Amino acid sequence: MAFQRSRAQRKKKHYPEIIIMIKKIIDHITLMLCRYEQKRQTQQKRVMSQTRQRREKQHQHNAFRQATPTESWQRERSVAMLAPLGLALLLVAVVASCARMGQPDGGWYDETPPKVIGATPADRGVNVSAKKVNIFFDEYIKIENPSEKVVVSPPQLEQPEIKAAGKRIDVKLADSLKANTTYTIDFSDAITDNNESNPLGNYTYSFSTGPQIDTLEVAGTVLQADNLEPVKGTLVGLYSEMADSCFLKVPMLRVARTDSRGRFIIRGVAPGAYRVYALADADGNYMFSQKSEQIAFSTDTIKPHVIDDMRQDTLWRDSLRIKDIKQIKYRHFLPDDIVLRAFNEEVTDRYFVKQERKEANNIKLFFSHGDKQLPVIRGLNFDEKNAFVVEPSARLDTITYWLRDTALVNRDTLNVELTYNMTDTLGHIVSQTDTLELLSKQPYERRMKDLKKEMDDWQKKQAKLKKRGERYDSVFPRKEIDMKLEAPADLDPDRNIKFTFGVPLARVDTSKIHLYAKHDTLWYNSRFFFRPLENEKLKGDSAATACYWAAATASRDRLEMQREFELIGEWRPDIEYSLEIDSAAFADIYGLESPTIKKGFKVPSLDAYGTLLFNISGMDGTPCFVELLNSNDKPIKQAPVTSDGTAQFFYLKEGEYYARLIVDRNNNGRWDTGLYEEGLQPEEVFYFNEKVECKAKWDITRNWSPRQRPLDHQKPDAITKQKAEKQKTIQQRNLQRAQKMGIEPPKEREK
């Protein structure tokens, strides 16, 4: 099968050089045999002469004496004849081997895919009762990733056994067969021959337990709802029942699995009306039973049918030249353009997940879902009154408790009683109390040991400086506040300066913050506004924002006890600025203060930027916003779609950009997922199907009709992460070899 190398399988006309070489070798061997024969005859005459002489001398022992030399002569003759013959065979083998090694095209490759020659029960058989299927091929085959690529429909709750056995495939169904039902075993492209991996192609075996077999098909694509990425390996199924509860209680009727492009084909469908669903089936029961499972659903009803249609089939002479284009009749199964948008529901069940005390000065509590009523902590081995600075996350699902008192920070174990709201088995919110032991990952003894080592190293360093007569310090430096300042040298006019502190602040003195702008050669005071940084995850969500600020300000004011701030200035193009912060402008809850800081930066000229405007049509006044994306599909700017259908982006640096539009039905400025029990689809997302190249001083306008192009053809390939796998095809190595030799390629070999 593999690389045809045996001489019997080679065609003489393709190997004239090798045949001529072998003939020369045979002629040479014949000459050698003649010489050996002459030598043998001479030796025979010598032996016979010696024998006659011995007969005359010893008459009594003639028989014995004559037999011995005669047998010896026969042995010598055999050796003399076998030696050249063995040498000849060895030379032929060496030459044949050399011909193969030195000739990379020593034989044609097997490029014929395997063929199905039969099956029991017969393919498309009816009134079948057997649960074991055997499919026979004309050569040895293998199945690649059967657990991923082979799908049995109707779905099997107990996994069938599927294996390749030489020239056949054995399938054993474990579930009981349903009456009057069409069964399909979709192998997709999993079947190849054993040696060269020539693909059989998409192959589906089917049979019916009733008197007729169903042959209709439906096809489509599954995409991630929030970014239109193809979803690979998810189940897509049909329900003939229209009730929404079927997806929650009953396994799918017929199923398929999506490929790397997100495409699916459900085969063996009976005429009728259906609803289509997709499911990342975590527990293998073919229904939506876990809220963490990714799903997709369509509220539309489909009716599978088939029509006679025509399609173009292109025949290629080689990889570059078209040989012919033919019009071919085929049966077109519809619908074949279903698009499902997959999403994960927001987890609303609340329960305690875990605790952390990685740093000695804070405790983190993690919950599955946020709650506007924060947990209550009661200290069991300390007084919890005024012991914490409480910092909730944006979604209120992670609560950080900063320990105010250093005595508590230095305590390795804190025992607390935690009371919080959780969801019970009936879905009701109830109060739950747990006892927790909070252990510091960095024990006090280790921290003191590290501090002592740090001081010893510092003292040694100062001693060396003193010994060399250089300047040294006599007082161990006071630790400064943990602060990160984000102020790039070139600050875009629509950006601000960000401050991030490692620990909540106890004091902010804005009188020690100074911003200067340079006009000509002089520096002038420039106005600014210093405030806590708004959480982007809460943008537009008034309810979440209210809960966040209620929790965040329960024991602190708007500046103190926070960790993130921004400085907003009146940034003017082509102007230099200097930010100067006096020492002790900031102090954290442990008394650490900020040092003197001076940071210079410039706002570039408007000539360094371009602008981009989208004229958006077909959205009928629905609230929308556009996100400008980088080459990694990450949003870098956001702009609302105005009432006149435009979205504008200013201060764009030179580069390549992409864009997506989000239909913001609740007008909260962010994408929201769906909820199946309420029949709520995730918010729609559309991609501009081209990249936009921006240049300095350019004003670019693009017209965009988001609903005009099919959803599965919108996202540009350049930013699509789930790439389509290369389709399995014959490698065409014989064609390449024939082109290299300047001869016609062989016809397909009959197996």
Which role fits each region the language model picked out?
Residues 3, 22-29, 33-37, 49-55, ...:
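N-terminal targeting or signal-anchor segments and their processing/structural boundaries
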Residues 3-5, 15, 45, 49:
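Short N-terminal alpha-helical targeting/association segments
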Residues 4-9, 17, 31:
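Short, low-complexity, charge-dense intrinsically disordered segments
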Residues 7-8, 42, 68, 72, ...:
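N-terminal polybasic/positive-inside topogenic patches
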Residues 11-13, 24, 39, 45, ...:
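Polybasic, lysine-rich low-complexity intrinsically disordered segments
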Residues 15-18, 84:
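Intrinsic-disorder-associated interaction segments
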